[in-house]
From Swiss-Prot:
Organism of origin: Neurospora crassa (strain ATCC 24698 / 74-OR23-1A / CBS 708.71 / DSM 1257 / FGSC 987)
Pathway involvement of the protein, from the record: Amino-acid biosynthesis; L-arginine biosynthesis; L-ornithine and N-acetyl-L-glutamate from L-glutamate and N(2)-acetyl-L-ornithine (cyclic): step 1/1; Amino-acid biosynthesis; L-arginine biosynthesis; N(2)-acetyl-L-ornithine from L-glutamate: step 1/4
Taxonomy of the source species: Eukaryota, Fungi, Dikarya, Ascomycota, Pezizomycotina
Ligand binding (substrate): 199, 228, 239, 325, 464, 469
Subcellular location: Mitochondrion matrix
Protein name in UniProt: Arginine biosynthesis bifunctional protein ArgJ, mitochondrial
Keyword Mitochondrion assigned: yes
PANTHER family: ARGININE BIOSYNTHESIS BIFUNCTIONAL PROTEIN ARGJ (PTHR23100), ARGININE BIOSYNTHESIS BIFUNCTIONAL PROTEIN ARGJ, MITOCHONDRIAL (PTHR23100:SF0)
Catalytic residues in the record: 239
Main location: mitochondrion
């Protein structure tokens, strides 16, 4: 009898092991965390091998060991101009604003968005919820950079990393002169700087391009930008840093409005996990080194630069979504035929951050009911309160489709509130693609909005569960 029981137990163990292996196989996906800081093969295509950088600007990234375990990765970055710049920045709306946010906001207000020379950034420690001492540390970082530039009160500060810990400030400030000496204007200098601001990012995010303005058709202007962020990403803004520099002569009087317009349509239209960080900052510096007529309000140059900056910011923001923690998909959410742009944005945002939608996409499941569910509750003010008359969403007029990125016809899931007979094989083909668009037609107006998001995978939990270790 003991032998028989042993045999049965052995078979059960083998069956259990087989089930475990089967489940592991089912649950596995194409994402895998980078090894030893290497860039995943699928992400290498997003890292530029050359660039066109604005005149008068230089950049650097060095390792100082903000985190004691980091002995190789760059973690302090400098981006600066050889002359004072007009500058503007958009900051997080989180009530617990980090010390560098408070410092940089105050500096821009004091200087009237003028006379800014550069930006100093550290990764590995957010310097957030660190009290008066943290604010003093942000000031010390700026002062160390100012001394290198031969200026005073001319440096913005950014930090990213773990919240609630003080910076190893002496280690940082004593090495800022070394970062200054390492500055240069080549592509490698800019790319190293972009690497220095990363935390859980799997690849550095850097874009550069040239453009023209109507009043100076013979002048080639340049714009370059770097950003970071892979988690705690949600509008207004997220654990997201962005530095954009241009050699166009943009007036300090219009720079804040131009930047806000661009950010609202780019960095404030992405979400990874719905969390808004304490440190979010996107800064724009314009030094006018390329010459030409100053860009001021109510001119063709203003409109042209606004378009350039918005398109540029959108491309930068999309890189953040493509590097979402554990993400395997890049998803565009488009809500059209809405009664108002505000309603369209709210619905798109709600769909984009829905855990049920995001996990269904990861599982390659055409569960359009989750999309419809998010659409239905998105404009209800608060759970538990009586539902208001939400006239912006009329079930009988609502349509939902998958739009393939390979150029083939859309797959209709819901038409005028009635479910379609879904071709599951076709749906599976679409959901196998890395890029996907979800289109919601409301049929209640002519406004629209677009959000970009990614899926949720098992790795998202692993990355964030291990973040402080």
């Amino acid at each position: 009898m003991e032998s028989l029981n042993g045999c049965v137990l052995s078979q059960l163990r083998q069956s259990g092991a087989q089930v475990t292996r089967t489940l592991q196989k089912i649950q596995s996906r194409s994402y895998s965390a980078p090894v030893s800081g290497s860039i995943p093969a699928a992400k290498k295509k997003y890292v530029p091998t050359s660039g066109t950088y604005p005149l008068g600007f230089s950049a650097s990234g060095i390792n100082v060991g903000v985190k004691p375990k980091n002995t190789t990765k760059p973690d302090v970055c400098l981006v600066a101009s050889d002359r004072p710049c007009a500058a503007a920045a958009v900051f997080t709306k989180n009530k617990f604003q980090a010390a560098p946010v408070t410092f940089s906001r105050s500096l821009l207000q004091k200087k009237g968005n003028q006379g800014i020379q550069g930006v100093v950034v550290n990764s590995g420690c957010a310097n957030a919820v660190t009290g008066k001492g943290g604010l003093e540390d942000a000031g010390k970082m700026a002062q160390a950079a100012d001394e290198c530039f031969g200026q005073s009160e001319s440096t913005l500060v950014m930090s990213t990393g773990v919240i609630g810990q003080r910076l190893p400030i002496e280690k940082i400030t004593s090495n800022i002169p070394r970062a200054h000496k390492a500055m240069g204007s080549t592509h490698d200098h800019w790319l190293t700087a972009a690497k220095a601001i990363c935390t859980t990012d799997t690849f550095p995010k850097l874009i550069s391009r040239s453009f023209k303005l109507p009043s100076s058709p013979s002048v080639e202007y340049r714009i370059a930008g770097m950003t970071k962020g892979a988690g705690m990403i949600h509008p207004n803004m997220a654990t997201l840093l962005g530095i954009i520099a241009t050699d166009a002569p943009v007036s300090s009087t219009v720079l804040p409005a131009v930047l806000k317009h661009a950010v609202d349509r780019s960095f404030n239209s992405i979400t990874i996990d719905g969390d808004t960080s304490t440190n979010d900052t996107v800064a724009l510096l314009a030094n006018g080194a390329a010459g030409g007529k100053e860009v001021v309000a109510n001119t063709p140059d203003y409109d042209a630069f606004q378009t350039v900056l918005t398109d540029f910011s959108t491309d930068l923001a999309k890189l953040i979504v493509r590097d979402g923690e554990g993400a395997t998909k890049f998803v565009t959410i488009r809500v059209v035929e809405a009664a108002s742009e505000e309603a369209a944005r709210k619905i798109a945002s709600t769909i984009a951050r829905s855990p049920l939608v995001k996990t269904a996409l990861y599982g390659k499941d055409a569960n359009w009911g989750r999309i419809l569910c998010a659409t239905g509750y998105s404009l209800v003010s608060e759970p538990g309160l009586p539902v208001n008359d939400v006239s912006e969403v009329v079930p009988e007029k609502t349509n939902v489709s998958f739009i393939p990125t390979d150029g083939t016809a859309e797959l209709k899931l819901l038409v005028n509130g009635e479910p379609e007979q879904v071709d599951e094989a076709r749906a599976a083909e679409i959901l196998e693609l890395e890029d996907l668009e979800i289109l919601v037609r409301l049929g209640t107006g002519d406004k629209q909005a677009t959000y970009w998001t990614c899926d949720y995978s098992h790795e998202y939990i692993t990355i964030n569960g291990d973040y402080r270790t």
